[in-house]
A protein has these predicted regions:
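Condensing-enzyme catalytic core mediating Claisen C-C bond formation in acyl metabolism
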Residues: 1-38, 139-173
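Solvent-exposed, charged/polar functional surfaces in cytosolic regulatory/catalytic domains
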Residues: 23, 52, 82
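Active-site pocket-shaping loop/turn-to-helix segments
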Residues: 28-48, 71, 95-102, 142-144
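Residues within alpha-helical segments
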Residues: 43, 47-50, 108, 112
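Phosphate/pyrophosphate-binding loops at sites that engage ATP/ADP/AMP, CoA/4′-phosphopantetheine
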Residues: 49-63
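Short glycine-rich or small-residue beta-strand-to-loop segments that form or flank ligand, phosphate
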Residues: 64-70
C-alpha cells in the first residue's frame, strides 16, 4: 500500500466543524485520514504501492494489469497507461476502470474471468485515489470518510486451488 503523507486526526475536523469530541469515530469507526501532500498524486501513489508490493513478492511475468481510480490527475489516458509508461511490464495487457467503491470488486471479477478462462496467469490490480484533492475542506458529510492512498494486489493462478497470502508494506499504525 501507499498512503498520503499528511496524517489528519479526527480532533482536527471535530474542532473545525465544532463537533463534540469522538463524534467521527463513534459514527464511522474512522480515527484518522491520510491526505496526499502537494507532490503526491493518484499516479504517484499507485506507482509507490506497486514498488512496495514488488519489494515483497516477485512481479515477473505479470500478463494483465487492472487499474481502478475515481480521481486520476488527467481525464485521459487511464491510470493503467500511466503505470505502463512508468513500469516494466512489456508483455502485459492494461485496462483502466473509472470506478469508486465497487472498483476493487469489479477488478477482482475481471481478474477471475481472465484466470478462469486461462487467458491470464498473473494479474495485478492497482487501486489509487486522492479524494482530498476534490473534496472541499468545509464538506462535513464526505471529508471525514476518505483517505488518500493506493493498493497493489497480485492475483495468480494456482493449480492446487485458492490460496490467500497477505503481504503488506508501509502499513500505517
Amino acid at each position: 500500500i501507499a498512503l498520503g503523507e499528511i496524517e489528519e486526526k479526527n480532533d482536527h475536523l471535530e474542532h473545525q466543524f465544532k463537533w463534540p469530541e469522538g463524534k467521527i469515530s463513534d459514527k464511522t469507526g474512522i480515527n484518522k485520514r491520510y491526505i496526499a501532500n502537494d507532490s503526491q498524486s493518484t499516479e504517484s501513489l499507485a506507482l509507490e504501492a506497486l514498488e512496495n508490493l514488488n519489494n515483497e513478492v516477485s512481479l515477473d511475468k505479470i500478463d494483465f494489469i487492472i487499474s481502478v481510480t475515481n480521481t486520476q490527475t488527467n481525464i485521459f489516458p487511464a491510470l493503467a497507461y500511466s503505470i505502463q509508461t512508468n513500469s516494466k511490464f512489456p508483455n502485459a495487457q492494461f485496462i483502466g476502470l473509472n470506478a469508486g467503491c465497487s472498483g476493487f470488486a469489479d477488478a477482482l471479477l475481471l481478474a477471475y474471468s481472465g484466470i478462469a478462462s486461462k487467458l491470464h496467469k498473473r494479474v495485478l490490480i492497482i487501486t489509487s485515489d486522492t479524494y482530498s484533492k476534490f473534496i472541499k475542506d468545509d464538506d462535513q458529510s464526505i471529508r471525514p470518510l476518505f483517505s488518500d492512498g493506493a493498493s497493489a494486489t497480485l492475483i495468480e493462478f494456482n493449480e492446487e486451488g485458492y490460496v490467500l497470502e497477505n503481504f503488506i508494506s508501509n502499513v500505517a499504525p
